[in-house]
């Protein structure tokens, strides 16, 4: 994944916006700022129906852009991060949605950010994603990535989820309850946190198993290292990747999950402080 950005030779920056929301005013402001630095702003086709700016499909946008801006909330950024891994391109999150942990600033603050950026004053963090291998009944394997989490949950008909977890074909845990979350460190402050899972530093090489409303008081979250792959078996359950892609567990004979070798380069202001963000968002010390 992209380790550094040649900020002195940026020619094109792609932009993907939060879907189904008009952000034309914000797009024009970003275009105006970037034009000062002789940088062309190019859009995903669906980002605006009105603006007369170059527009591309998502794959072409990544191919021609030096990096890509996500203008929206955490959900917009998460879906973009999975795609960024395919093209080895960095992503910058600008907030225009529900306030989250991943987007650092609003469009009104973009002028100050880019002034610093084009002087080399920025940082890149590279959180790891999850790899999910879904093997269907015919032996075909589908590989997916998750930025935040994979959630196994009961379907509407089941009274509870029965989930078995194996390591090297040996069962090491069995869960009865509403479901199971497999979360990345970056995703530890999302659904995992709501289910009383631990907060894990974003750049840690680990992942988390957190039961959801377990029927046993002894079932607790567990943090596992990179290189530790688990196999999950559960009948009549659904598997959801990053809250965006859904699969029926019954369609697969094997589902394996572990921390991926792939990470995504996220561009941040140089003064970004992870623990200050936790303090502000979670109201620590108030």
Curated annotation (Swiss-Prot):
Cystine pairings recorded for this chain: none
Catalyzed chemical reaction(s): NAD(+) + ATP = ADP + NADP(+) + H(+)
Catalytic residues in the record: 74
Keywords assigned: ATP-binding, Cytoplasm, Kinase, NAD, NADP, Nucleotide-binding, Transferase
GO biological process: NAD metabolic process; NADP biosynthetic process
Cofactor: a divalent metal cation
Record's keyword annotation contains Kinase: yes
GO cellular component: cytoplasm
Chief location bin: cytoplasm
Coiled coil: none
Annotated localization: Cytoplasm
Residues reported to bind NAD(+): 74-75, 148-149, 178, 186, 189-194, 244
InterPro entries assigned to the protein according to its UniProt record, in alphabetical order: ATP-NAD_kinase_N, ATP-NAD_kinase_PpnK-typ_C, NAD/diacylglycerol_kinase_sf, NADK
GO molecular function terms attached to this record: ATP binding; metal ion binding; NAD binding; NAD+ kinase activity
Enzyme Commission (EC) number: 2.7.1.23
UniProt KW Transmembrane helix keyword: no
Superkingdom of the organism of origin: Bacteria
EC class of the enzyme, as a word: transferase
Family membership: Belongs to the NAD kinase family.
Described function: Involved in the regulation of the intracellular balance of NAD and NADP, and is a key enzyme in the biosynthesis of NADP. Catalyzes specifically the phosphorylation on 2'-hydroxyl of the adenosine moiety of NAD to yield NADP.
Listed name of the protein: NAD kinase
Organism of derivation: Campylobacter jejuni subsp. jejuni serotype O:2 (strain ATCC 700819 / NCTC 11168)
């Amino acid at each position: 994944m992209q380790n550094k950005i040649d900020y002195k030779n940026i020619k094109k920056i792609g932009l993907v916006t939060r879907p189904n929301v008009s952000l034309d005013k914000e797009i024009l402001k970003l275009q105006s700022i970037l034009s000062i630095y002789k940088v062309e702003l190019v859009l995903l086709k669906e980002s605006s129906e009105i603006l007369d700016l170059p527009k591309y499909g998502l794959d072409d946008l990544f191919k021609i852009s030096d990096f890509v801006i996500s203008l929206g909330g955490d959900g917009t950024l998460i879906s973009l991060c999975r795609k960024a891994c395919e093209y080895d391109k960095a992503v910058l999150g600008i907030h225009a949605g529900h306030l989250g942990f991943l987007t650092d600033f609003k469009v009104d603050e973009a002028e100050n950010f880019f002034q610093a950026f084009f002087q080399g004053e920025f940082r890149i963090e590279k959180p790891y994603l999850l790899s999910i291998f879904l093997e269907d009944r015919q032996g075909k394997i589908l590989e997916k990535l998750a930025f935040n989490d994979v959630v196994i949950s009961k379907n509407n008909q089941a009274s509870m989820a029965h989930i078995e977890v194996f390591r090297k074909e040996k069962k090491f845990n069995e869960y009865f309850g509403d479901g199971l979350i497999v979360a990345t460190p970056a995703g530890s402050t999302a659904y995992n946190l709501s289910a009383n899972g631990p907060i894990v530093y974003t750049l840690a090489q680990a992942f988390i198993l957190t039961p959801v409303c377990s029927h046993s008081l002894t079932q607790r979250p567990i943090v596992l290292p990179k290189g530790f792959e688990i196999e999950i078996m559960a009948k009549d359950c659904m598997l959801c990747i990053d809250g965006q892609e859904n699969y029926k567990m019954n369609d697969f004979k094997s589902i394996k999950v572990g921390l991926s070798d792939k990470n995504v380069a996220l561009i941040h202001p140089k003064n970004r402080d992870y623990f200050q963000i936790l303090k502000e968002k979670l109201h620590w010390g108030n």
